[in-house]
Amino acid sequence: MHVKKGDTVQVMSGKDKGKQGVILKAMPSKNRVVVEGVNVMKKHAKPSQANPQGGILEIEAPIHVSNVMPLDPKTGKPTRVGFKVVDGKKVRVAKSGESLDK
């Protein structure tokens, strides 16, 4: 996958097109990611030990990884991801040449 947990991304298509957020969870086996504040669904929860009140919760549902693009650290715009080998490690690189991995 071209994105990882903690990356700042922009949604490129769907009902939340244009929104930006941080990836909270990545699911490579399903090709899906959960982005903060994107694809928010309402879930009905029964009262439990963790949530004694119960009620309606708003949670982020996963979206397909093809619908998001990471933001370039240099320009702040969505960018495609390339890969380079630096010191024997495969590193993700934005098209501007800036490294996406910390």
Swiss-Prot record:
Gene for this chain: rplX
PANTHER family: MITOCHONDRIAL RIBOSOMAL PROTEIN L24
Family the UniProt entry places it in: Belongs to the universal ribosomal protein uL24 family.
Free-text function comment from the UniProt entry: One of two assembly initiator proteins, it binds directly to the 5'-end of the 23S rRNA, where it nucleates assembly of the 50S subunit. One of the proteins that surrounds the polypeptide exit tunnel on the outside of the subunit.
Keywords of this entry: Ribonucleoprotein, Ribosomal protein, RNA-binding, rRNA-binding
GO BP annotations, alphabetical order: translation
Oligomer and partners: Part of the 50S ribosomal subunit.
Keyword set includes Oxidoreductase: no
Protein name listed in UniProt: Large ribosomal subunit protein uL24
Gene3D superfamilies: 2.30.30.30
Domain of life: Bacteria
GO cellular component, one term: ribosome
Region (Disordered) residue spans: 1-22
InterPro entries: KOW, Rib_uL2_dom2, Ribosomal_uL24, Ribosomal_uL24_CS, Ribosomal_uL24_KOW, Translation_prot_SH3-like_sf
Organism expressing this protein natively: Exiguobacterium sp. (strain ATCC BAA-1283 / AT1b)
Molecular function (Gene Ontology), one example: structural constituent of ribosome
